[in-house]
Regions:
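Juxtamembrane loop-helix boundary motifs flanking transmembrane segments in multi-pass membrane proteins
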Residues: 1, 32, 36, 278-286, ...
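Generic detector of multi-pass transmembrane helix bundles and their immediately adjacent loops
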Residues: 298-431
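Hydrophobic alpha-helical transmembrane signal-anchor segments
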Residues: 2-28, 32
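Cytosolic-side membrane-insertion boundary helix
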Residues: 272-301, 320
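Intrinsically disordered or highly flexible coil/loop and linker segments, enriched in small
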Residues: 50-54, 135, 396, 422
Length: 431
């Protein structure tokens, strides 16, 4: 090109794009570290308890149905009658008609190396009623029934986390829980065999039991078609209410939260995937913030290069492309330092140290050319890093804040260069 400024601008633009390669590599490193963190957390959960889902209890009554088939036929002019006794084994499942849950959850952390998993211990109390229909009798006119010992089944997704299961009280008597659901409709959980329960002449059976359950990340309850009320309390200030049903009311404070749910049987419909769920999450996770911060790499390097170009034009300084490259690499190193330090110190402290190191390095590199330039860039980069930190901390307003920042920077450039004679600067050099 005939104009050296245009040629240099093109070179600097290519340099900025080239510096996206190390920034992209750092983003890949963040994803790799996040995957390793997830593996460590999953390993801790394997030994403590995974995400837990507890289903409403239901009564399982095995029975034998007996009936007689009478076959009449005429043989040699005589009517003969043959009676055949038939029997089959079946299961009657009676879901709870109403369940009240009380859940008190305490959270803790366990570490594996530098990675930490958020775990919980839940004290769960359940009480309710199971309706026994009229057909649960010994005869119905055409068939005879032999009823075996019923059992109460409670589905629990990860039985490893069951720390204690006190005896269930059903119909005024107590029965011990046994491992496993012992029912084809549940894959994991507990059951209690009700030996000698006289359910034939009862319209409803009251029940109650208590569980001590350990898990990680989230806790959910499945109503399974029952009228359900839930009162939950936990010492975690950042709950995420998930599942099919949101709480009717909740109160969230610095020391934790309380929440209450009311779900009717008409809303629940008995589906296992329709749950009341709470996830114990960070509002903005560490690796999520690191990944979001690395997305601003192009903005940081591009704005710094543009500031250098403007300074070169307005102050008539000579800044070599190598200097652009070195400053750009220092800016890229910020994200690597941030990733490495945050795993040990936390995001806030790591951000402050990485910012201080990079601003000090770039300012020291520029101070020999001009103290004023070094001070200007040091203050400008510090302000830029401060704005970025605010954007990262405010997930809901990050787009709005970023848009306003770019608009303010564009306005500053436009107003600051109103008197610049761009034709004179970019005119081809005379021979």
């Amino acid at each position: 090109m005939k104009n050296p400024l245009v040629a240099k601008a093109a070179l600097i633009g290519a340099l900025v794009l080239g510096l996206m390669i190390p920034v992209g590599m750092i983003r890949g490193l963040v994803a790799e570290r996040q995957a390793r963190s997830n593996e460590a957390i999953a390993g801790i959960a394997e030994g403590w308890g995974k995400r837990q889902s507890v289903a409403s209890p239901y009564l399982v009554i095995p029975y034998e149905r007996q009936w007689t088939v009478i076959k009449r036929e005429t043989i040699d002019g005589k009517l003969r009658e043959t009676r055949t006794e038939l029997r089959e084994l079946q299961v009657l499942r009676l879901p709870a008609s109403s369940v009240s849950w009380t859940v008190d959850t305490a959270l803790s952390e366990k570490a594996r190396g530098i990675y930490k998993a958020r775990l919980y211990s839940a004290h769960i109390t359940a009480s309710g009623m199971i309706d026994v229909p009229a057909r649960a009798s010994s005869e119905d006119g055409t068939s005879r029934y032999r009823w075996y010992n019923p059992k109460l089944v409670v589905g629990i997704s990860d039985p490893l986390g069951i720390r204690a299961a006190r005896a269930v009280r059903l119909g005024g008597k107590e029965y011990a829980f046994r491992p496993g659901p012992d029912d084809a409709n549940a894959t994991a959980g507990l059951h209690a065999v009700m030996e000698g329960v006289a359910f034939m002449n009862r319209e409803a059976l009251p029940f109650s039991f208590t569980l001590e359950l350990a898990g990680s990340e989230a806790l959910s309850l499945a109503p399974l078609g029952a009228d359900t009320t839930v009162a939950m309390r936990a010492d975690w200030p950042h709950p995420s209410f998930q599942g099919r049903f949101l709480p009717a009311k909740h109160d969230i404070g610095k020391s934790g939260f309380t929440a209450d749910w009311r779900v009717s049987r008409f809303a629940a419909q008995g589906a296992k995937n329709e749950t009341i769920a709470v996830s114990f999450i960070e509002p903005v996770g560490l690796y999520q913030m690191l990944e979001r911060a690395s997305k601003y790499g192009f903005l940081f390097i591009g704005l710094t290069a543009a500031a250098f170009m403007l300074l070169e034009i307005l102050r008539r300084l000579a800044i070599h492309p190598i200097q652009y490259a070195l400053v750009g690499l220092a800016l890229a190193m910020f994200f690597l330092l941030l990733t490495a330090l945050s795993e040990h110190l936390g995001f806030g402290a790591a951000y402050a140290l990485a910012t201080s190191a990079c601003v000090a390095l770039i300012s020291a590199y520029l101070v020999r050319s001009s103290r004023a330039v070094a001070l200007f860039f040091g203050c400008g980069l510090t302000a830029l890093y401060a704005v970025l930190y605010a954007l990262l901390q405010s997930e809901d307003y990050s787009l709005l804040g970023g848009s306003l920042l770019l608009f303010a920077l564009l306005a500053a450039v436009m107003l600051g260069t109103r008197r610049v004679d761009w034709y004179g600067i970019t005119a081809p050099a005379s021979r």
